[in-house]
Amino acid sequence: MGEKKEETATKPQGEKKPTDGGITTVVMKLDMHCEGCGKKIKRIFKHFKGVEDVKIDYKSNKLTVIGNVDPVEVRDKVADKIKRPVELVSTVAPPKKETPPSSGGAEKKPSPAAEEKPAEKKPAAVEKPGEKKEEKKKEEGEKKASPPPPPKESTVVLKTKLHCEGCEHKIKRIVNKIKGVNSVAIDSAKDLVIVKGIIDVKQLTPYLNEKLKRTVEVVPAKKDDGAPVAAAAAAPAGGEKKDKVAGEKKEIKDVGEKKVDGGGEKKKEVAVGGGGGGGGGGGDGGAMDVKKSEYNGYGYPPQPMYYYPEGQVYGQQHYMMQGQSSQSYVQEPYSNQGYVQESYMNQGYGQGYGQEAPPPPYMNQQGYADPYGHMRAPELFSDENPNGCSVM
């Protein structure tokens, strides 16, 4: 008998046998601009094993490959060549059934004892419903963790030199470009720049120093907005002062005279108001004690000019005839000054009165003015003359 030789044909591992499943239609979608793209794709499948036909639909940008091929391999090949994304439209072929490698001997069969013993099932762990609810709550709490609150808008006051309106426009333009800035206000009188928004002060100052080429300082904010609080506190304080002053005025109205020991002089309390006397009493006034002997009054009024009637003046007699004009020149001593006042009198024709003259002052028998008549007015609103007034 002849010996039978078993011939085993070995093939290289790189080669793949075409699937024995028959012809497969692979539809792919990709971008094709023109017929040149279609010709290039057809050249790709010219030497591809298993491909029988290639169809291209330019309107819908679809490529159809017919043959005994692997759809995934065809898609990767096209995408690699044209350098564009390729989408596989048709369903992928089912995977191949892998045959176990032949070991040369009879296949081992499982022992009948192993087949008879069914697989032992482990008891499932019993879970309590309360534990599940707690776990779900924890997971939901972690997911629904409140996000961090957004940063609050703040106001930053910067101090820098402002020379002119050009500087102000430049600073506004630079600051408005910073992210988070809402508004910019400039106080040129105090050289202040007020910036409102969500700002990082540590990064803002060096940035402005570099851009403006000048020093920019941050004015520290007062604690708890001290300015408004101070203003609010000042308002009631002012009201309290006004109430106190009003009460003092009411008390001062009941004026009482007191006798001073030894001198016998009388002292009277006078309320002297300040500020708003004629304007409706708006200002605050204070009360003070005024003595008649201590009140100096106002300055001396200007010395008036006097017209003297015809007759003797300083012992000199001037005779006038009717129808003749006369003039007399009189020197009067100014009280308490040490110099002499000169007055020029003009008398008209007839009786000597060419012009209406004011009433003559008090004259004594010698015909000259009383020097005591030129002294300063008595004390303002004194006891002797409560309605008197001095001419300023």
From Swiss-Prot:
The keyword NADP does not apply. One of its GO terms (biological process) is cellular response to hypoxia. Cd(2+) 1 binds at C34, C37. GO terms for molecular function: metal ion binding. Changing C37G: Loss of metal binding. Residues 23-86, 153-216 form the HMA domain. Heavy-metal-binding protein. Involved in the maintenance of heavy metal homeostasis and/or in detoxification. Belongs to the HIPP family. This is Heavy metal-associated isoprenylated plant protein 6. The gene is HIPP06.
